[in-house]
Design a protein with these regions (language model features):
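Bacterial N-terminal signal peptides that target proteins for export
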Residues: 1-11
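C-terminal motif of bacterial Sec signal peptides marking the signal peptidase cleavage site
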Residues: 19-22
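Bacterial signal peptide processing site
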Residues: 24-27
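A structural signal for conserved, well-ordered secondary-structure elements
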Residues: 31-183
Length: 183
């Protein structure tokens, strides 16, 4: 019985910690207004948020890619094609549970996670999906509204799609202004 008390305390602390972390996520983040000034003067980049970090802990050394690393973005399929990098992007993305897309230090949107075809979790908000099944020789990256796609018609996903409308408009308008939009 003596040995079970410390274990029970540790379990209670762990559960409370996970609950507080889950409750502190920014599901009600405010929409970013569309601003042509951001498009003209801003720089697009993405940073990773580690498992033990919060969004405010993200530092400059956590930059995963910038607009210079994006070759093009297909509006129809939402495929995002990256240029060749020294370290494969999927390896750089693996330690992070969130990816924040910035335009000139303003958050455009937060991608819930980097997921691969092997992932068996369900995500009801934006994800960066790494597809290696359709082309094993070269993986493809997609920005999806959820993962797996069979959850696209749920109320939660539909609400998130509406919530992200202005951000998508800004993101695509910016990429179009840089000649990186593909239809």
């Amino acid at each position: 019985m003596k040995h079970q008390r410390p274990l029970a305390r540790m379990m209670a602390i762990a559960i409370a910690g996970m609950t507080m972390t889950a409750c502190s996520s920014d599901d009600n983040e405010t929409e970013m207004p569309f601003s042509p000034d951001l498009v003209e003067n801003g720089i697009l980049y993405a940073c990773g948020v580690g498992l033990s970090e919060t969004r405010t802990d993200v530092e400059a050394n956590d930059v995963l890619f910038t607009e210079n690393d994006i070759e093009w973005f297909n509006v129809t399929t939402r495929e995002i094609k990256f240029r060749e990098m020294q370290e494969p992007l999927y390896q750089r993305l693996q330690p992070f549970h969130e990816i924040i897309f910035y335009l000139d230090n303003n958050i455009i949107f937060v991608v819930s996670s980097f997921v691969g075809d092997w992932d068996n979790r369900v995500f009801t908000d934006l994800v960066l999906h790494y597809d290696v099944i359709s082309d094993p020789n070269q993986g493809h990256y997609y920005l999806h509204d959820c993962y797996p796609s069979q959850f696209i018609d749920t109320d939660e996903v539909k609400a998130n799609i509406i919530k992200n409308t202005n951000q998508w408009k800004l993101f695509t308008y910016y990429l179009k202004s840089k000649g990186k939009l593909k239809k």
